[in-house]
Amino acid sequence: MSKFGHIHLHTVYSLLDGYCKVKDVVKRAKEYGMNFIGISDHGTLAGIYEFDNACRAEGIKPLIGCEVYFTHDVNEIVKSKDERNEIAWERFLSATGTTDEEYKKTTKKAKLELCKEYLYDTKGYHLILIAKNQTGLNNLIRLTSEANDIAMFNGRGHVDYSLLERYNEGLICTTACISSVVNHNIRTGEIEVAKLHIAKLQELFGDDLYLEIQPLDWEEQVFVNKEAMKLSKEFNVKLIATTDVHYTNKEDDYEHDILLCIGTGKLYKDPNRMSYDHEFWFRTEAEMIDAFNRNNYSDEEHNLYREAMNNTIVLANSVDDNIKVGADKELLPHTEVPEGYNSDSWLSRQCWLGLYKYLTDNNLMDQRRVYEARLKEELDVIITKGFSDYMLIEQAAIKKGTERGFGFGPGRG
């Protein structure tokens, strides 16, 4: 049995970035003796139902998570570029104790140069959130939904501390990759800023906060790992080791590269295109250790790394075993139908009456056998699948919309 499990993993539901097919990566976890595995797709929970089913079919504990995009203020990021520039200019004036009148002859370009350090940071920093219990999953669903509803920027929903404060209950947080709000500031030498974010996240998540380290062969990553180890002691926060899985097999890196080219609209031969180092496959426990051993770490740091690997088990054990993904019952509302009918029989009656009216109005009664056979087949599928109520709801919506003058297409699916 492996003494490590992956909790930072992107499936194909991380659109045009993740290359792990759910069933394949779950089977790989089984092969490697991992009794748990986590999903953390970018900004979406679309894959959790398939993932949960696949894990449970293999006897593996699913950890339901999401790598969310963090911003400093969801209200500001959704403003137009001109509005953000104006806010930056006001900040500049306030900070310098000057007035707009003093710059009335200054060009717009020159103003932007003057206030550039006050421009809003629109980067989407990463954080991983994992449901610890049913409340956590419910909050994660609400959080990602609200992020997409109120804070969409560059096609991605964003969260800030105000949203995390509202929905933090039942959630575990890790500081993700070097693109996280913590690790980015470590990487750029802004250690004190990183400390402020750790303190805030610790306030929100308490003992369920983990500082994430990864055994990648980048100089920047090694630096971040070493600093994270120091900060874990200073703040008494657990470390956790991940490898940011984006594809199942080591040799899948080429296909993953092509996927990135499609996602970014770049040619494979473009030297300036977005590309990952070839380090993001689903590693074994031994490969995780070997990767870390290749770099210049002290004995103490090696021990901390092994502890961080073991903390994947600590995290997994803290998650409830029976978190329910999906509803226990059908959520589709039932429609009211005339006495003596149910949804199936009323839909059938409406369809048959509609068919014969159509055939009569269009002089097609001589071809009715073909139409009757087709309608019977379609009704059989709809009724068998339990979609009669859905069709009746659609009929009512279209009828009401037509009465109000709305146009509708043919609706061929």
Map each language-model feature to its residues.
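Short active-site oxyanion
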Residues: 35-37, 126-127, 236, 405-408
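Hydrophobic or amphipathic alpha-helical targeting/insertion segments
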Residues: 44-153
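Domain-core and long-helix interface of multi-subunit machines
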Residues: 2-39, 43-58, 93-103, 110, ...
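A residue-level signal for conserved active-site and pocket-lining positions in enzyme catalytic cores
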Residues: 41, 62, 133, 140, ...
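Phosphate/diphosphate-binding loops
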Residues: 61-64, 74-76, 113-114, 118, ...
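A short acidic-Thr-Gly-centered motif at the start of a beta-strand
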Residues: 119-120, 230-236, 397-404
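Conserved phosphate/anionic-ligand binding catalytic regions in large, soluble enzymes, centered on
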Residues: 135-136, 176, 240-249, 401, ...
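Non-catalytic structural connector segments
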Residues: 2-3, 68, 81-82, 182, ...
